[in-house]
Design a protein with these regions (language model features):
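Acidic (Asp/Glu-rich) sequence patches and key acidic residues
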Residues: 1-149, 154-158
């Protein structure tokens, strides 16, 4: 049985698009974008090597403030890219279908989350190590302290 750790990053004063593109450039772990509570999955970068910044902009422009279903978002991916590009997203969806963490509250402060899929998580120190890894990853993004868009990190474990 798998466990899922969802890291939520709180922003301060940056555009959602800029923050999302920063995710795509900076991390090699599973990614999840939330807008109006809608989970939006990206897999690790290899299957998405051909996804361009323009494509991401198109995807983001298609995500309106109106509530869309997860299938609506997947259809957007299909429309904008070759089906093979999103295959790993569909595989992830299959794995999460019965174990997705459910509704995630989205506020003005919460613009995204990173979904980390691991084996069973039983020891607190393993969770702490993963949180430290995420903090290190953010440090590598080389934001000046005053310009860093993230002001808090917390995690839900399911």
């Amino acid at each position: 049985m798998s466990s899922y750790i969802c890291f939520h990053l709180k922003r301060k004063g940056v555009e959602k698009k800029d923050l999302f593109l920063s995710y795509c450039r900076s991390t090699k772990i599973y990614q999840c974008f939330h807008d109006s509570g809608i989970p939006f999955y990206y897999s690790n970068p290899e299957p998405f090597a051909e996804v361009t910044e323009n494509m991401l902009n198109d995807i983001l422009s298609d995500i309106s403030l109106e509530r869309q279903t997860h299938q609506d978002v997947l259809k957007t991916l299909y429309r904008l890219s070759d089906k093979s590009v999103v295959q790993s997203v569909l595989e992830l969806e299959d794995q999460l279908r019965d174990k997705w963490i459910g509704e995630i509250e989205c506020t003005d402060d919460l613009v995204g989350a990173i979904l980390w899929r691991e084996g069973e998580v039983r020891e607190l120190d393993r969770v702490e190590v993963q949180i430290e890894f995420l903090k290190d990853m953010l440090d590598e993004m080389k934001y000046d302290k005053d310009d860093c868009p993230f002001e808090g990190i917390y995690a839900n474990i399911v």
